[in-house]
Amino acid sequence: MGDRGGAGGSRRRRTGSRPSIQGGSGPAAAEEEVRDVGAGGDAPVRDTDKDGDVDVGSGHWDLRCHRLQDSLFSSDSGFSNYRGILNWCVVMLILSNARLFLENLIKYGILVDPIQVVSLFLKDPYSWPALCLVIVANIFAVAAFQVEKRLAVGALTEQAGLLLHGVNLATILCFPAAVAFLLESITPVGSVLALMVYTILFLKLFSYRDVNLWCRERRAGAKAKAALAGKKANGGAAQRTVSYPDNLTYRDLYYFLFAPTLCYELNFPRSPRIRKRFLLRRLLEMLFLTQLQVGLIQQWMVPAIQNSMKPFKDMDYSRIVERLLKLAVPNHLIWLIFFYWLFHSCLNAVAELMQFGDREFYRDWWNSESITYFWQNWNIPVHKWCIRHFYKPMLRRGSSKWAARTAVFLASAFFHEYLVSIPLRMFRLWAFTGMMAQIPLAWIVGRFFRGNYGNAAVWLSLIIGQPVAVLMYVHDYYVLNREAPAAGT
């Protein structure tokens, strides 16, 4: 056979045909391949065509088709392209939620009623207490401005200014809380919105006071470099720089109050123009997502919450867990939509209108592998304020990092409870407890979970933790406002 192969090879050479080894056919080629395998240990890699199929060529002598390799799902394989599995997960998620949606429609019918939403804001169409509260907030902004004007010219001492600012800031928190708690005509939703406005005003005026104080301290240290001090105080980025005390104008104050940030600067980064198409997209997103959230709450969450009251009353723990898991899906979906609506659509729309240049309102919190990373990246405006006006000042005063972090969580827990308990007119401290529980949870996740496991733990805390707080408050509110009056009659 070897001689015949050799003769065949020489005959092809004489007739001008291609060599047998190029086509991979013939016993000689096969024998050569066997020798190569014996020397190298692996089968030669076959040529492939443009579709990825092996180029068969003119022969049929495939003596070896196996090689040393791992399965794709093995960690040693190095394979990482699971795009098809991700698409499968998305398809399964859509199908499972479509089934839940159809089940909900069959069981309850269409519950979406946009007109009913108006009643959440107004009890009396001729009485708008929440809007009146928001308008009154201007008084506190003007008061802070007047204090700063007098401090700038030396008409007030720093101690007197600190006292006046403290009284003003304390009143900002106490005044709307008293009105919301005592005024019967204000609705819980209207109360929440008014208290959110006052909370934002509190944080902004706190920052306004701090930055102007830093400017005065630098001016006192080097009066000859007042303009440079004002530039350094805000980070040194501006097309048209303003120095202290030239920043103390109503125009500057109200630009800051409406800007999508909580941290004051003398010179904010500004975008060159308003992009009309970008702004229109954000406005359409705001409109669509608002309607979507209202529809999901009315159609999906409200029935789930109502059906959860009986298991809580009977203390049927298995049914409570089942209702909790049933509520977790719509609650988490609405929370994700709310995040996009607020931090991307709304804040970008406001920033575009005001040509506010810093658009970092969130970072990649969805990749969080620890609870700490999540809280540092999901709400950048609040995070920047906490670092600049709370965390770093505590460190400069000698506090430890652990004490400063605990104080930040404590302040956050207070404001969460402030925005929930006062509108509902009941104090159960569920929101406060939930926020303070983040401290040991952050330690546990950081200590025992890494990588994808840490990310899964963060997602699990978001998906399960929020519905627990929602059910606690709804149950207590239901008992307080439904069963108590019925028992009294």
UniProtKB/Swiss-Prot annotation:
Pathway: Lipid metabolism; glycerolipid metabolism. An acyl-CoA binds at residues 375-383, 391, 405, 478. Residues 116-127 are annotated as: Extracellular loop 1 (EL1). Residues 355-400 are annotated as: Intracellular loop 2 (IL2). It is found in: Endoplasmic reticulum membrane. A motif (FYXDWWN motif) lies at residues 361-367. The keyword NADP does not apply. It is an enzyme of class 2 (transferase). Residues 1-54 are annotated as: Disordered. Residues 1-88 are annotated as: Involved in homomerization. Residues 128-489 are annotated as: MBOAT fold. Residues 225-277 are annotated as: Intracellular loop 1 (IL1). Residues 116-127, 182-188, 310-316, 422-429, 483-489 are lumenal. Catalyzes the terminal and only committed step in triacylglycerol synthesis by using diacylglycerol and fatty acyl CoA as substrates. Highly expressed in epithelial cells of the small intestine and its activity is essential for the absorption of dietary fats. In liver, plays a role in esterifying exogenous fatty acids to glycerol, and is required to synthesize fat for storage. Also present in female mammary glands, where it produces fat in the milk. May be involved in VLDL (very low density lipoprotein) assembly. In contrast to DGAT2 it is not essential for survival. The disordered N-terminal region is required for the diacylglycerol O-acyltransferase activity and may regulate enzymatic function via its interaction with the MBOAT fold. The MBOAT fold forms a reaction chamber in the endoplasmic reticulum membrane that encloses the active sites. The reaction chamber has a tunnel to the cytosolic side and its entrance recognizes the hydrophilic CoA motif of an acyl-CoA molecule. The chamber has separate entrances for each of the two substrates, acyl-CoA and 1,2-diacyl-sn-glycerol. Belongs to the membrane-bound acyltransferase family. Sterol o-acyltransferase subfamily. This is Diacylglycerol O-acyltransferase 1. The lineage of its organism: Eukaryota, Metazoa, Chordata, Craniata, Vertebrata.
